[in-house]
């Protein structure tokens, strides 16, 4: 009798634990962040194709798309373009691009976007083809129509302030309900590469609202993960679906951050004696790369530390190639040979360990992540059906 009673208690405990686990997963807020990096967007594009393919297999649904699984998708520069591609609706109110269309997009349009014959002395490219293809693909779609929350950064050079385009901010700032093609060009308009972008919208009172924007990396550097997280936490104050992460409860967050590779240049060491002899030109050649790489490392370090301190390290995954070499380091080398190399970098990255301390490969980690995303979606769908 005592044995039977103990067995029943054990069953109840298991059921209670399982129920708690499911409830916890259902409450999770999911965030995807995509770095900037020009043509190197092929690398996260390859990763996204793998992840979406896994979700389609798990849910036995060839029409499954990343926007169905993430509450917030954020990006800067080329990451902002990828964000728009997988969240902007087509005529059927589904993302106009599947993840497996991202890499072919770069191969088709990259050589025309980064065509040196269109450049001028003070910038490398005129940006006309980039704007043309953005208008063609994104049409008249505006921020409010995105299929999930987005976070795309840019920087206004007239006001010297970052401009962040999100759905949740439109109630307070309706003038930021801009056309997606204007936003995508702006976040990609890296100084010395493309011209800054001017356009105007209207305020709630009908007044003209002018924007003079450049690359989002000026505002958030290349890694927009903290921006994407902050958009999610801010939305938690108003949206019940995000309530679980109020008070910065990162235990209730799943964060996937995709990089475009670090450069070998940053791995070169310099001594104080050597750099003391440098002039402005020598510093200019390396300081931007050093600053961007250091900031990206610090973002990853901060997020890793926070999730580890909360014993939730499996809730955060940073996918990054360290380091790139040769032509793959260039943000604007859209030669077919280099794009093939970048695609191979992405494929090879899947087989590499997550870190020195974690032998799990990125492929295994992404499959685990996909399982969490799939299970969470099913739990929410079941709850909604009652």
From Swiss-Prot:
Glycans are attached at residue 115. Residues 32-229 form the PNPLA domain. Residues 360-384 form a coiled coil. The keyword Transferase does not apply. A motif (DGA/G) lies at residues 215-217. Pfam families: Patatin (PF01734). GO terms for biological process: defense response; lipid catabolic process. A motif (GXGXXG) lies at residues 36-41. Residues 1-23 form the signal peptide. The active site is at 77 (nucleophile), 215 (proton acceptor). SUPFAM superfamilies: FabD/lysophospholipase-like. A motif (GXSXG) lies at residues 75-79. InterPro entries: Acyl_Trfase/lysoPLipase, PNPLA_dom. GO terms for molecular function: monoacylglycerol lipase activity; nutrient reservoir activity; phospholipase activity. Its EC number is 3.1.1.-. The keyword Thylakoid does not apply. It is found in: Vacuole. GO terms for cellular component: vacuole. Keywords: Coiled coil, Glycoprotein, Hydrolase, Lipid degradation, Lipid metabolism, Plant defense, Signal, Storage protein, Vacuole. Patatin have a dual role as a somatic storage protein and as an enzyme involved in host resistance. This tuber protein represents approximately 40% of the total protein in mature tubers. The nitrogen atoms of the two glycine residues in the GGXR motif define the oxyanion hole, and stabilize the oxyanion that forms during the nucleophilic attack by the catalytic serine during substrate cleavage. Probable lipolytic acyl hydrolase (LAH), an activity which is thought to be involved in the response of tubers to pathogens. Belongs to the patatin family. This is Patatin-16.
């Amino acid at each position: 009798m005592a044995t039977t009673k103990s067995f029943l208690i054990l069953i109840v405990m298991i059921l209670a634990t399982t129920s708690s686990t499911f409830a916890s997963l259902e409450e999770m807020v999911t965030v995807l962040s995509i770095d900037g990096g020009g043509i190197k967007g092929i690398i996260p594009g390859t990763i996204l194709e793998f992840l979406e393919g896994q979700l389609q297999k798990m849910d036995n649904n060839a029409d499954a798309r990343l926007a169905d699984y993430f509450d917030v998708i954020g990006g800067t520069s080329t990451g902002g373009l990828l964000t728009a591609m997988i969240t902007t609706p087509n005529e059927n109110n589904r993302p106009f691009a599947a993840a497996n269309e991202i890499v072919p997009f770069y191969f088709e349009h990259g050589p025309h976007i980064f065509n040196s014959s269109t450049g001028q002395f003070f910038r490398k490219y005129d940006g006309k083809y980039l704007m043309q293809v953005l208008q063609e693909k994104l049409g008249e779609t505006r921020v409010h129509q995105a299929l999930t929350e987005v976070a795309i950064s840019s920087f206004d050079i007239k006001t010297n302030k970052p401009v962040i385009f999100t759905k949740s901010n439109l109630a307070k700032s309706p003038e930021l309900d801009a056309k997606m093609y204007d936003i995508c060009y702006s976040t990609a308009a890296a100084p010395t590469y493309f011209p800054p972008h001017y356009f105007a919208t209207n305020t709630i009172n009908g007044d003209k609202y002018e924007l003079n924007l450049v690359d989002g990396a000026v505002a958030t550097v290349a890694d927009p993960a903290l921006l994407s997280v902050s958009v999610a936490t801010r939305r938690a104050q108003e949206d019940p679906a995000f309530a679980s992460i109020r008070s910065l409860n990162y235990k209730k967050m799943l964060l996937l951050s995709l990089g475009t590779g670090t450069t070998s240049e940053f791995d070169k060491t310099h001594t104080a004696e050597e750099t003391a002899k440098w002039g402005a030109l020598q510093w200019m050649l390396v300081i931007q790369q050093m600053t961007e790489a250091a900031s990206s490392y610090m973002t990853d370090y901060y997020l890793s530390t926070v999730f580890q301190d909360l014993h939730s390290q499996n809730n955060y995954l940073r996918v990054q190639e360290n380091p790139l070499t040769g032509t793959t380091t260039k943000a604007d080398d859209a030669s077919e040979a280099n794009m093939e190399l970048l695609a191979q970098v992405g494929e090879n990255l899947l087989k590499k360990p997550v870190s020195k301390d974690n032998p799990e490969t990125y492929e295994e980690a992404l499959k685990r992540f996909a399982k969490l995303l799939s299970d969470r979606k099913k739990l929410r769908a079941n709850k909604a059906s009652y």
